[in-house]
């Protein structure tokens, strides 16, 4: 493992390590309290994790359509949980605790574009958002607000589609197959103005402001990097879920590779390196950026036509594979303890069907990530292909972040790590690995 870490350092585009990354941003989804069984997470189970975290981001608040006010997505839970969470500062006085808005948890089928509506709103309506945010934050003892706005996403690439002539401009190179927001330039300017107004109000109240760039939200469309970065205390890039079984049901590939693999018509922006470099090349200080790592994996259902090797890109997949027994996700999401329980542990054990273990394939190059698979049987059933970052690969990414001169790592999120120690007996193995290799 140590040899592999030194190896990847040689692949970095920097020549020296000038500092130790210091930020470890820990996301906590309050919905984890509502889960059943072993997936249910209580606030007292955060204590062990918070000795490693510099910031805790509590998710998620929402944006009220019409009035555009910040509001709790679960009043019955949050009316108690908000203050329980901020009270953790008594045990961890150096911990900064922020409330995140959006984060793909603010589901509003009647107003799916309400975050764009906030950008387009007049100054009075935007002030409702600012004022309501300050009231909610101050009333409950939060240190600041994290903007995880649910903005329009890149369209997924077309299966077997041609990339044409590699597009006619850099912007098209970064957008995927289609432009989904023809008013993107206007929205970029509006977002910059809104953030400036929020920052001005927060500054007088001594409140922090951070940005989370959600997966597949196009930075070239919405973020004027040179103007934006001075307004934020830090910026978290959720550099994962580039491909998922929901977005890409007919082909499976690495969900969060570090580097671009120039094969099989992959899109060149679907990797960590491209996302980080875009912000750095647009004059964002590295210390403002935190690399986002997922503590979960994504699972596709394999067909007989998907073959036996599992080497990505895997074709003829059939969308989402069944979730694990703890999270029970309908989106092909498996937490780390769910993943490790599916990997082969006992070579002598004989299981068939859905109980048969998955065979893990480790990426010896440490560039793209690990995967595991169970080919479909003769009837085309029980096939699974799973992409994930295990504790070792999360450590590799921590080393990468140090080498790029970034501020640190953002872990999405604590409730998907093995907070009960079910895999090996050690609790929070992904978080621990990140902290160890950050130094």
Curated annotation (Swiss-Prot):
Q: Name one Pfam family in it.
A: Glyco_hydro_18
Q: Cellular component GO terms, alphabetically?
A: extracellular region
PROSITE patterns noted in UniProt: GH18_2 (PS51910)
Effect listed in the UniProt record for changing residue 313 to V: In strain: MB48b and MB52b
Domain spans labelled GH18: 22-439
List keywords of the entry alphabetically: Developmental protein, Disulfide bond, Glycoprotein, Secreted, Signal
Show the InterPro entries listed in the entry: Chitinase_II/V-like_cat (IPR011583), Chitinase_insertion_sf (IPR029070), Glyco_hydro18_cat (IPR001223), Glycoside_hydrolase_SF (IPR017853), Glycosyl_Hydrlase_18 (IPR050314), IDGF (IPR015520)
Q: What is the effect of changing residue 399 to E?
A: In strain: MB34a and MB39b
Residues of the signal peptide:
1-20
Tissue distribution is: Primarily expressed in yolk cells and fat body. In larvae, it is expressed in large salivary gland cells and weakly expressed in imaginal disks. Less expressed than Idgf2 and Idgf4.
Q: What is the annotated localization of this protein? A: Secreted
The effect annotated for residue 305 to E is:
In strain: MB01a, MB08b, MB29b, MB36a, MB45b, MB47a, MB48b and MB52b and MB80b
Q: Which domain of life is it from?
A: Eukaryota
Family named by the database record: Belongs to the glycosyl hydrolase 18 family. IDGF subfamily.
Instruction: List the protein's name.
Output: Chitinase-like protein Idgf1
The species this protein was found in = Drosophila melanogaster (Fruit fly)
Output the lineage of the source organism.
Eukaryota, Metazoa, Ecdysozoa, Arthropoda, Hexapoda
What is the gene name? Idgf1
